[in-house]
Structures are given as C-alpha cells and as structure tokens.
Amino acid sequence: MKIKALSKLKPEQGIWMNEVDMPELGHNDLLIKIKKTAICGTDVHIYNWDEWSQKTIPVPMVVGHEYVGEVVGIGQEVRGFQIGDRVSGEGHITCGHCRNCRGGRTHLCRNTIGVGVNRTGCFSEYLVIPAFNAFKIPDGISDDLASIFDPFGNAVHTALSFDLVGEDVLITGAGPIGIMAAAVAKHVGARHVVITDVNEYRLDLARKMGVTRAVNVAEQNLEDVMKELGMTEGFDVGLEMSGVPSAFSAMLKTMNHGGRIALLGIPPSSMAIDWNQVIFKGLVIKGIYGREMFETWYKMASLIQSGLDISPIITHHFKVDDFQKGFDIMRSGASGKVILDWQ
C-alpha cells in the first residue's frame, strides 16, 4: 500500500510531496495514523539544504518530527497502549544500551537517532515508532497543542533547568521555543521575564504570551530596559535560544554574579566567549539537547492542565496539500508555529 508523504527527494532546496510504502510494524512498535504535524526550524534547515543538512540528511527520506496521531496498530510485544489512543512522540530514538540509557538519563544517549533527521519522519499519513517513544495525550489537550509537544518540550526542558521562582529571566531569541520558554517562566513564578530579538513580528507574539518586556535590540538598549524595571544587579537566569554570538555576549554582560545559563541555541563553533564574565561572575552554563525522557513530557501536560496557555504561538494552519505555503511562511520569519492538517 502506498501513502502520501513529504520528503527530501533531491540534494537541493525544497521539500516534495510523493508516495511511499506503508511503514512496517515491528514487535516493539506502534503504527500511528497522523492527524496533524508542525513545521520545525529543523525542517526549514532541511528545506533550505544548508551546510548542516548536507552533512546530516540522507536523500531520499520522509522528513518531520512534530506530530499528533492515533494508534492504529500495536506490535505484539507492546504493553500499555490501545487502538485509538491519541499520541505524540519523542523524536529522539535512543539505544537503550549505553551508560546513560541504562542509568535512566536517556536524553543523554550518545547513539541518538532523530526521527525525520536520521530515519523516516512523521510528514506522512502513517508513522511507525518504538512504543517506548510514544506519549499518550491526556484528554482536554487539543490536537493542535499535542502536535507541538516536541518544541514545547525544548522550551520546558530549557526553562525548568533552574529554579525560576522570584527570579529575573533573560531569554535571547524570540522564536517559537524562546516565546514558549518565556510563557513557562512566567507561569511558574519568575518575576521579570525579558525576551530579546530583532524580529518585530515575533516580539509582538511574545508580548501576547505575557512577557514582562519584549526588546528589539536593534532599537533599544537592554541595560536601559533593566533600569526601567528597577533591576540593579542583573539577570538571575539566562535562556539562550538564538545561537547568535552577539546575543550570548549581551547575556553574559547582563547576568548577575552567580547567575545560571541554559543554552539551547546552536552558535557557530568559532564563537568567542568573554571568559572573564563567566569566571569572575561564577556563572553556571548548561547545554540543553532535546527533552528529558519522559519527565519533560509529563511536565508539559501538567503545565497545560494547570492553566498555561501556549495556543497563541500557533499562528497558521494549512491542509497538507498546501504544505508549500506553510514552508514559505515559516521561511519568511512572520509566523509562530505552522500546523499541517493531514485529515
């Protein structure tokens, strides 16, 4: 049986709709009928066929890793799932054998394989993944929100790396993950949450999500904003989401002594760091990759169930046949999360 999919078919710019074989269900797998998928910044990198994509992505391959769907097939060894369960899933498939996997630190597996990056993705009518990677979506959480649990998890993992209650938080990079991290920080009790970017559309989106201040650093000085807020000592927690060297440099300068920084954005390997800021301020810097399995997933569901509203981050919906419009709007920068409807 052939099914519809969105694939990287050629080593050049673009994503194409094609037909692929129905995936085969293994003993430990679930077969998921896809309802909705969301376009990730990673998918845009793959579309653009940048240097990272050229080194990483096998061609041809079905792409995508943000989704919600319904369980329609269950491998014979699988327990804990039923036909009809609504699921999303962890996009990092881990080995189960390395020291970190065996120690319960699965998100630090050294042999991680990415859905839609190293193996067949979810931009397809059906997806097969290990049942271990599936997460049942609680009733009361919409399909739209469930489809963005993967990037929401990046935001939650990063934001909750440190205690935020009563703290002043700086977030550099107002992409969807940065904005969701800001909403999480406010929800769990941070005092001032300041987010910086140069994209006015996304700064407006951050304002709608409740940040204290959204600062266009091309037009406004971060130190001036801190004075206006009555901040005399610097930020307690920094969440770096942009990968932009100048943003990280500004963060280091404005951190309080003893401040803590979580890094999710991927800067160029040649990025220079003012180590005086790190050493003499006693800063703690932590790298973040993916989501904790599955603690972050339970926290995501609980945050939404306790009243966190991240729905404004979803700005566009398209039928899957109009996927090109979705990629165009994502590439323009004038969007939050873009959802493709497969049904």
From Swiss-Prot:
One of its GO terms (molecular function) is zinc ion binding. The active site is at residues 42, 45. Zn(2+) 2 binds at residues 95, 98, 101, 109. PROSITE patterns: ADH_ZINC. One of its GO terms (biological process) is L-threonine catabolic process to glycine. Its cofactor is Zn(2+). Zn(2+) 1 binds at residues 40, 65-66. Keywords: Cytoplasm, Metal-binding, NAD, Oxidoreductase, Zinc. Its EC number is 1.1.1.103. Binds 2 Zn(2+) ions per subunit. One of its GO terms (cellular component) is cytoplasm. Coiled coil: none annotated. It catalyses: L-threonine + NAD(+) = (2S)-2-amino-3-oxobutanoate + NADH + H(+). It is an enzyme of class 1 (oxidoreductase). It comes from the Bacteria. It holds the Pfam family ADH_N. NAD(+) binds at residues 177, 197, 202, 264-266, 288-289. The record marks 150 as: Important for catalytic activity for the proton relay mechanism but does not participate directly in the coordination of zinc atom. It is found in: Cytoplasm. Gene3D superfamilies: Medium-chain alcohol dehydrogenases, catalytic domain (3.90.180.10), NAD(P)-binding Rossmann-like Domain (3.40.50.720). NCBIfam families: PRK05396.1, tdh. Homotetramer. Catalyzes the NAD(+)-dependent oxidation of L-threonine to 2-amino-3-ketobutyrate. Belongs to the zinc-containing alcohol dehydrogenase family. This is L-threonine 3-dehydrogenase. The lineage of its organism: Bacteria, Pseudomonadati, Pseudomonadota, Gammaproteobacteria, Vibrionales.
